[in-house]
Amino acid sequence: MERIPIRITALLVMTTLAACDFLDIDTPGIVNRDKMFENEQGFIDAMNGVYASMADADLYGEQLSFGFVDEIAQLYYNDYEANETTLTKTFDLRYRDEDVRPQIDAIWSKAYNTIASANSVLDNISGHDFAILPRIRGEELTVRAFLHFDLLRLFAPNIERGDEQAIPYVEHFSISPVERSTVREVYERIVADLTEAYGLLRDAQ
């Protein structure tokens, strides 16, 4: 699958998420990021926002549940081979087709957008001592690892080619692009995030 333009996507995603930082006034209906994390409820709301983003049709609301991933796995019976539909093109693994490529770009962008939201929560935990924060940190680390894992399996070589370049593993909210890590490095970071998350969530029970 053709590599996604990482630098451009990262800039667009992070600019969108950080837009409120460039405003000196509060806009009705928009919550300033600094104010969002002033209290425990703000963290809960932000966490719920991450889960809502994961439920989007570009992620687990469709494409990564029963949509694109099932189509490229050819789990659907293709009874319309004579018709040029997006489904048949995806079924045939025509990744560069003008109808298929937007699906791929949307998955990539939405996944990193959601990772950025999770990282925003994680970056703002420091300096607060709300009782719920260990559980929130554990959940957001899990989300970050989970999304990177799905991006890795879709857009990178398998672990047998562990030294090859894979995807960026993004660990902080930033508008700066992140260089790609190797397949092995991404797996190591996934395991590290999940290991910490397991301890936090176990102790939060």
Model-found features: residue ranges?
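Membrane-proximal, proline-rich intrinsically disordered regions
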Residues: 20-67
